C-alpha cells in the first residue's frame, strides 16, 4: 500500500489533494459523506483524528491568494491557518508579484490636490517632502493591496527617528500614470504643496513701541561773575609827598 501525504484542498474545496513519494505525483480524494463518516468513526486512530483537524484548517489556494491580495503577509496567513509557510508562499507568489507591480505603478501616479492632480508624480512629491523634513527618501517602502471593492490601497512606510510612519493613498490606475488620493492625515501632509514649511513653527516676535527720546535742549553757558576784587582793579598807591602832606588818594584830605 502506498503512503500519501495530504497537501491541501483544491481550488473548489471539494477534493483533498494528496502527494505520493514523488512530488510530481498528486492524487485527488473527494470530500464526500463517506470520507466524513470515516473521519467521524469512533474506531479511527488518533492519527486519523489529527488528519481531520488538519484538513479542516487547510486553506484552499483561492483562499490563500484572496488573503494575500487583501494585504496579509505570508507569515500572517500561515500563522492564522496553521499551514506550512512553504505551501502558503507557493500560492502567494503570483499575488505578491501583482501587489508589487501595483505599488510600482503608484509611484508614477499624480497626487490629487485641492485643485486637481499635481504635475509631479507621487515619487517626486514624496521624495521632495521627505528631503525637506531632513529624512532620507531611499528608506521609503511602497506596498499595495486590493480591497473588497477591487480598488487599490497604497501604503508608504518610513522611519523618522524611532517612530514608524505610515501613509495611505487610494490608487486609481489610468492614463499618464493614474492618480493617488490621500486617505489619512499623514498622506495629506506628504502631498501638501506647503511641505517645505518649518517642522516647528516659529512664534511671532512681539514688537514693542518705545518712545523716542526727545532731543536734548542746548545748554547756555553763562560766564561766572568775576570776583569783586578783579572788577575794581588794583588799589591806588599814594605818592610819598601825598603821604607827608596828608593828602588821600583821589585828591581828598
From Swiss-Prot:
It comes from the Bacteria. Residues 218-229 have a biased composition (Polar residues). Residues 211-235 are annotated as: Disordered. NCBIfam families: SepH (NF040712). This is Uncharacterized protein Mb0907c.
Amino acid at each position: 500500500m502506498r503512503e500519501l501525504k495530504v497537501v491541501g484542498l483544491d481550488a473548489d474545496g471539494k477534493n483533498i489533494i494528496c502527494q505520493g513519494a514523488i512530488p510530481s505525483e498528486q492524487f485527488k480524494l473527494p470530500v464526500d459523506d463517506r470520507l466524513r463518516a470515516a473521519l467521524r468513526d469512533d474506531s479511527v486512530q488518533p492519527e486519523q483524528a489529527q488528519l481531520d483537524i488538519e484538513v479542516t484548517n487547510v486553506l484552499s489556494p483561492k483562499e490563500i491568494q484572496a488573503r494575500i491580495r487583501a494585504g496579509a503577509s505570508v507569515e500572517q496567513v500561515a500563522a492564522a491557518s496553521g499551514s506550512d509557510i512553504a505551501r502558503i508562499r507557493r500560492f502567494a507568489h503570483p499575488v505578491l508579484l501583482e501587489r508589487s507591480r501595483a505599488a510600482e505603478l503608484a509611484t508614477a501616479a499624480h497626487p490629487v490636490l485641492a485643485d486637481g492632480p499635481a504635475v509631479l508624480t507621487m515619487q517626486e512629491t514624496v521624495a521632495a517632502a521627505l528631503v525637506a523634513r531632513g529624512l532620507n527618501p531611499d528608506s521609503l517602502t511602497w506596498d499595495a493591496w486590493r480591497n473588497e471593492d477591487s480598488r487599490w490601497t497604497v501604503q508608504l512606510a518610513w522611519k523618522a527617528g524611532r517612530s514608524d510612519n505610515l501613509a495611505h493613498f487610494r490608487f486609481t490606475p489610468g492614463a499618464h500614470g493614474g492618480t493617488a488620493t490621500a486617505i489619512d492625515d499623514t498622506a495629506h501632509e506628504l502631498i501638501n504643496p506647503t511641505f517645505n514649511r518649518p517642522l516647528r513653527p516659529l512664534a511671532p516676535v512681539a514688537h514693542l513701541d518705545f518712545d523716542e527720546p526727545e532731543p536734548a535742549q542746548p545748554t547756555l553757558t553763562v560766564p561766572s561773575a568775576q570776583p569783586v576784587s578783579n572788577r575794581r582793579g588794583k588799589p591806588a598807591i599814594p605818592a610819598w609827598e601825598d603821604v607827608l602832606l596828608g593828602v588821600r588818594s583821589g585828591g581828598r584830605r
